[in-house]
């Protein structure tokens, strides 16, 4: 704890003579050389002996009383003897010897307490962090004293003023203590500098205009947490960028320095549907090969086109009590030679062998190859009609015949007994009258084992089960209804065939 030199030393010694001797010994000993050392916090080492508290002084004095006589040295006697003035005569010599003995005992006790307190102060000083203002103030005072006298003179009043801060305040100093209302004792110069900067009462002080706090808000970013009124609006700015609506068929220009290759010439023509008499025409989106245009829709090559035979529409309002049929989904698949033909077509288009044909694929799928060859195509200046027909045939073969679209097949729909069979030997319905018994006996080419317009088997007189034109018969006896028969045979009635064969 760094206390005041006057009060602490008076409590320890109660003698003004010894205080004068101690200050004089410090000046003569050259202890003030450590004043400019930043590692010692700008305090002299000789004053660490007086920097202990009362408890340490009592302990040091009690321990030093036992070894007072043994610790006295000749150098101390000579040192303290030299500090006092000399007296003449024998009486003066006795007084000098008595004073030296008393002062040497006090000097030895202070030196012993100094050795014990320096170790304690070194441990405590490691936790001390001097403020920057106090350090800079002491440096300025030291430099100003050196410039005036050429050395570092220290007076008692100035030294007392520089050691006002206690050791407890140095050990516990932080930002909160420095920023408190209590002024720091070593910040006199800083306070003076601040006073110089503040204007006088008579000076005119210009009031700076107060800038209001502004905030830029996007209308789309407002939420329920914001509360604004009309009077809060200062100005309305247009948006930085407004996206314009752009159609899907718009074209994007490509600069001349772009690496995009030129696309071949596109052909626009009409295909007349002979069945319906309708005309289909698609607008060409590329003008010529001289313009650097690219198609945005060409990014999707494998586009699924609608089927030529739409599925029959069912009335969803009629609820059926029957079970829904089990259907099998056939995924979209490609032919094994699809990629080969696709690579050939792409290579020919890049080399301008085949032109880019703009045609409705839905209508092209309905045409046959012979109809494509017989099309009347308007002559183009850069492309021949044969190249256009070859491009149409290649496109139809690639995207219509080699691509199997996704569809739902009824489970077992492709089995023979679920197909639609028709009679080939009888095309006319028989008379509604009773059939003669000799009809089956005569060898008639139009006869059949199954009655064409009846569901009764001819050789079963006691059954009314229908015999289908195509099916399977169980040859073995079924012992368990849950198990499948051991032997089955498929049959087709004579004179009946699949409707696809006609």
Swiss-Prot record:
Name of the protein in its database record: Protein GIS3
Subcellular location: Cytoplasm; Nucleus
The encoding gene: GIS3
Keyword hit for Nucleus: yes
Note: Present with 1055 molecules/cell in log phase SD medium.
Main localization category: cytoplasm
GO-annotated cellular components: cytoplasm; nucleus
Key words, A-Z: Cytoplasm, Nucleus
One biological process term in Gene Ontology: intracellular signal transduction
């Amino acid at each position: 704890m760094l206390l005041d030199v006057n009060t602490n030393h008076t409590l320890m010694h109660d003698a003004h003579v010894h205080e004068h001797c101690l200050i004089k010994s410090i000046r003569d000993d050259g202890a003030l050389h450590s004043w400019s050392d930043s590692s010692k916090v700008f305090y002299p080492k000789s004053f660490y002996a007086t920097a202990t508290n009362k408890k340490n002084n009592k302990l040091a004095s009690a321990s030093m009383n036992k070894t007072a006589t043994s610790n006295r040295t000749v150098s101390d006697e000579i040192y303290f003897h030299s500090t006092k003035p000399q007296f003449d005569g024998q009486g003066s010599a006795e007084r000098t010897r008595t004073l030296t003995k008393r002062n040497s005992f006090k000097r030895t006790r202070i030196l012993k307490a100094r050795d014990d307190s320096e170790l304690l102060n070194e441990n405590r000083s490691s936790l001390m962090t001097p403020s920057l203002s106090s350090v800079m103030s002491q440096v300025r005072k030291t430099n100003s004293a050196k410039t005036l006298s050429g050395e570092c003179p220290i007076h008692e009043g100035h030294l007392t003023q520089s050691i006002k801060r206690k050791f407890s305040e140095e050990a516990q100093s932080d930002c909160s203590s420095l920023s408190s209302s209590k002024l720091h004792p070593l910040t006199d110069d800083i306070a003076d500098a601040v006073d110089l900067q503040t204007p006088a009462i008579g000076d005119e002080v210009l009031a700076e205009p107060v800038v209001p706090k502004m905030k830029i808000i996007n209308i789309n970013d407002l939420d329920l947490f914001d509360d604004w009124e009309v009077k809060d609006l200062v100005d309305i700015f247009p948006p930085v960028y407004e996206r314009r609506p752009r159609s899907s068929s718009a074209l994007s220009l490509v600069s001349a320095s772009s690496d995009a290759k030129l696309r071949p010439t596109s052909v626009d023509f009409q295909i007349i549907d002979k069945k319906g008499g309708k005309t289909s025409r698609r607008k060409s989106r590329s003008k010529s090969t001289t313009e650097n245009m690219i198609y945005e829709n060409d990014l999707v090559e494998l586009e699924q086109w609608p089927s030529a035979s739409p599925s029959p529409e069912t009335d969803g309002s009629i609820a059926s009590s029957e079970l829904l049929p089990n259907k099998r989904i056939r995924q979209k698949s490609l032919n094994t030679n699809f990629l080969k033909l696709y690579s050939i077509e792409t290579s020919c288009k890049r080399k301008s062998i085949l032109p880019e044909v703009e045609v409705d694929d839905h209508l092209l799928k309905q045409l046959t190859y012979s109809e494509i060859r017989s099309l009347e195509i308007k002559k183009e200046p850069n492309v021949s009609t044969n190249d256009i027909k070859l491009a149409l045939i290649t496109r139809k073969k690639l995207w219509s015949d080699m691509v199997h679209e996704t569809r739902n097949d009824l489970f077992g729909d492709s089995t023979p007994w679920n197909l639609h069979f028709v009679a080939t030997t009888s095309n006319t319905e028989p008379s509604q009258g009773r059939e003669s018994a000799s009809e089956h006996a005569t060898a008639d080419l139009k006869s059949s084992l199954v009655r064409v317009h009846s569901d009764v088997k001819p050789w079963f007189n006691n059954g009314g089960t229908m015999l289908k034109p195509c099916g399977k018969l169980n040859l073995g006896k079924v012992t368990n209804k849950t198990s499948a028969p051991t032997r089955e045979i498929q049959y087709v009635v004579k004179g009946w065939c699949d409707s696809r064969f006609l």
